[in-house]
């Protein structure tokens, strides 16, 4: 803490904690200015034990102040001595008396404030040192640091706990710092500064003695600070709430004022508008009409220009798009033509290579084998076999057991039930009434419940509950709902009872077996009839070959490569046509007014015909050869057809020989070999001789 000594013009320092404190005496001189200007000051000791730096009044050692500090108010309070008068520098005694008067007034006000506050730990700051020049104050010894500075101090001027006060200043940085007399001297003497509560604590003699025993700066110890009382905390909380309310009130007040100002502006604008409308004249209306017409014409012109611009841009874009489509279409057609041309060239190359390597005959044989009836018959038998059906069931079960397939099936089934049963109970009643006349033994419970025969008990129970809710007489007001419910109940009785359900399943299996056997017999009979109607006898292999009816008219049956058109055909005409770029040759014949494909028969006969010729190369007459006659003759109408003869022999197990002359029940004629062999055994009775049946041997199809 620093204070001014009016008797001297120098800087006095009071030491605490090994340091020195500076005070100004005389006029208020800034320490920074002194540190740079007073380079030749001497060091002395004051009578009260303080160290003083005497300032020489030599003008050579003192730098004159800058006059700009006195003329420009933005530089803050003046530093150093005042501006020089006309006669030179001001008198030192007058300056000291004026400053001491100001300091006395400030110290009195501070003392009065401290007494009102009631805090005994704060002492007033006197304007002048009372112990100045008093011999009663003993001089202290040197400090413990040994730097030669005096450890004695004036307790009226400063406090040894100044370091702790500085720490308190940092702790309470939101409060006003203490004003020193050097700062008070800068305040104009015409105005009285407001008194402020001092936050620095000045210790008494007992506190100083106690603090002298321990080092306040000792490391490892906590520094004690003044604690706020509960009253101060409560007062702070109350002040905080009041301040918040005040701020909210101010904000609301200013918002209300701004709202009133805004409303006033709008009212003023409306008033101006009404006033301007009242001042309008008839000529103003004409001018307004003219102005509207001008702007309407301008807007119309702008709209017309914009429409023309948009239409032109649209047509240009559409034209570009159409051109682009044409170009893309041309490129696609070109690419397609190139692709087809490459395919044709590649196919021709492969055909030529196959002809040279001899693969053409093998390829034709492979195609004919794939289209052979033996392969189709084998595939049919494979599909009808039980292992194949079990394999298909296992595959279907595994596919349905997949998680995503099961979820999709469940969703579809739920939606179907919800849409078909819950929404349309009348249709369910009508469906059940159609089965009301069916006897209970013949009733199909699964069909009644609308589920599959492989449904589980849970699914059956769920279906029964859903249907019972819809067709029950208490729920459905249909006049015949009771009959429908009886049908449903009968089906449920069959399914719910395990014994009755087992009996029904066995009965159903027997019926299915019988129906399946009958169906197999009928299907086989139908196939035999079709085969008998669509087969041809072969004199080369003594077998039969199938023929296929073609969807062609006799008037346009034959294709001619020379004319590139279809020519008419006559009964018995036999020709050939090529397909698949000449790899496959098909043989046709006109029989019974229909065109048939007889490729199998022609292949077995090894007939070589040039395909797609203009004239018919062969003419077929279906008949039997008569010994002793040359050529072919038509069969007599008395003998039955060969196909029907073979069909009847297969059904009734009769050899085809007895039917050669048209008599189905005629006795068999002995063969040419039987006459020679029967002569030695002529004594054998007639009833013991049993004729041998000839078995018809089918030879495999050969190309």
Swiss-Prot record:
Arranged from A to Z, the UniProt key words for this protein are: Chaperone, Endoplasmic reticulum, Membrane, Protein transport, Transmembrane, Transmembrane helix, Transport
The protein's name? DnaJ homolog subfamily C member 14
Q: Where is the J domain?
A: 444-508
Q: Which organism is it from?
A: Rattus norvegicus
Q: Which GO terms describe its cellular component?
A: endoplasmic reticulum membrane
Composition skew (Basic residues), residue ranges = 193-202, 219-228, 691-703
Q: Which SMART domains match?
A: DnaJ
Start-end of Basic and acidic residues biased regions: 203-218
Q: What Gene Ontology biological process does one annotation of this record name?
A: protein transport
Chain's role = Regulates the export of target proteins, such as DRD1, from the endoplasmic reticulum to the cell surface.
PROSITE patterns, per the entry: DNAJ_2 (PS50076)
Q: Where is this region: Disordered?
A: 1-150, 164-229, 622-643, 659-703
Q: Which GO terms describe its molecular function?
A: dopamine receptor binding; G protein-coupled receptor binding
How this chain assembles, per its entry, is: Interacts with the FxxxFxxxF motif of DRD1 via its C-terminal domain.
């Amino acid at each position: 803490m620093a204070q001014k000594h009016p008797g001297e013009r120098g800087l006095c320092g009071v030491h605490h904690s090994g340091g020195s404190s500076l005070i100004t005496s005389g006029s208020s001189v800034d320490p920074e200015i002194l540190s740079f200007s007073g380079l030749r000051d001497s060091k002395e000791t004051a009578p009260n034990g303080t160290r003083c730096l005497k300032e020489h009044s030599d003008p050579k050692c003192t730098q004159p102040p800058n006059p700009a500090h006195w003329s420009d108010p933005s530089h803050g309070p003046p530093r150093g001595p005042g501006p020089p008068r006309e006669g030179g520098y001001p008198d030192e005694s007058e300056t000291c008396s004026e400053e001491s008067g100001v300091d006395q007034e400030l110290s009195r006000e501070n003392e009065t404030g401290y007494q009102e506050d009631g805090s005994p730990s704060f002492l007033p700051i006197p304007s002048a040192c009372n112990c100045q020049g008093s011999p009663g104050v003993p001089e202290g010894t040197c400090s413990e640091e040994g730097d030669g500075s005096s450890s004695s101090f004036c307790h009226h001027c400063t406090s040894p706990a100044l370091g702790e006060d500085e720490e308190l200043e940092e702790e309470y940085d939101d409060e006003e710092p203490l004003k020193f007399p050097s700062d008070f001297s800068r305040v104009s003497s015409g105005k009285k500064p407001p008194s402020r509560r001092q936050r620095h604590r000045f210790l008494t003699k007992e506190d100083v003695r106690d603090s002298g025993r321990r080092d306040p700066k000792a490391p490892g110890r906590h520094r004690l600070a003044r604690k706020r009382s509960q009253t101060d905390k409560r007062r702070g909380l109350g002040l905080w709430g009041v301040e918040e309310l005040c701020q909210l009130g101010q904000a609301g007040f200013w918002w209300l004022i701004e709202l009133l100002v805004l409303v006033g502006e709008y009212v003023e604008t409306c008033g101006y508008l009404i006033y301007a409308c009242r001042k309008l004249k008839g000529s103003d209306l004409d001018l307004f009409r003219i102005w509207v017409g001008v702007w309407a014409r301008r807007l119309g012109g702008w709209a017309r220009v914009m429409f023309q611009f948009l239409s032109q841009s649209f047509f240009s874009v559409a034209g570009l798009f159409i051109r682009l489509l044409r170009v893309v279409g041309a490129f696609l057609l070109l690419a397609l033509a190139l692709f087809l041309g490459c395919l044709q060239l590649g196919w021709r190359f492969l055909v030529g290579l196959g002809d040279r390597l001899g693969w053409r005959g093998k390829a034709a044989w492979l195609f004919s084998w794939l289209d052979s009836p033996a392969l189709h018959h084998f595939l049919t038998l494979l599909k009808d076999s039980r292992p194949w059906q079990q394999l298909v069931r296992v595959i279907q079960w595994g596919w349905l057991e997949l998680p995503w397939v099961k979820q999709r099936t469940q969703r579809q089934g739920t939606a179907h039930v919800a849409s078909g049963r819950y929404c349309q109970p009348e249709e369910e009643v009508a469906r059940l009434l159609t089965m009301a006349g069916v006897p209970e033994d013949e009733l199909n419970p699964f069909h009644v419940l609308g589920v599959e025969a492989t449904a589980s008990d849970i699914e059956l129970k769920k279906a029964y509950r859903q249907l019972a809710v819809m067709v029950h007489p208490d729920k459905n007001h249909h006049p015949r709902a009771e009959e429908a419910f009886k049908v449903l109940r009968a089906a449920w009785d069959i399914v719910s009872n395990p014994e009755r359900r087992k009996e029904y399943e066995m009965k159903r299996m027997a019926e299915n077996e019988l129906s399946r056997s009958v169906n197999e017999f009928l299907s086989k009979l139908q196939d035999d009839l079709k085969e008998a109607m669509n087969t041809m006898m072969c004199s080369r292999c003594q077998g039969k070959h199938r023929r296929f009816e073609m969807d062609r008219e006799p008037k346009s049956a034959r294709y001619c490569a020379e004319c590139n058109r279809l020519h008419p055909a006559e009964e018995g005409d036999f020709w050939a046509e090529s397909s698949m770029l000449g790899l496959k040759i098909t043989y046709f014949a006109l029989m019974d007014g229909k065109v048939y494909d007889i490729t199998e028969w022609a292949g077995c006969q090894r007939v070589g015909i040039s395909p797609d010729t203009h004239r018919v190369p062969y003419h077929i007459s279906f008949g039997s050869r008569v010994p002793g006659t040359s050529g072919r003759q038509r069969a007599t109408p008395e003998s039955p057809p060969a196909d029907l003869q073979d069909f009847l022999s297969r059904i009734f197990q009769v050899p085809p020989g007895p039917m050669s002359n048209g008599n189905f029940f005629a006795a068999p004629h002995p063969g040419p070999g039987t006459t020679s062999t029967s002569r030695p055994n002529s004594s054998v009775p007639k009833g013991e001789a049993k004729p041998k049946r000839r078995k018809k041997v089918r030879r495999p199809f050969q190309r």
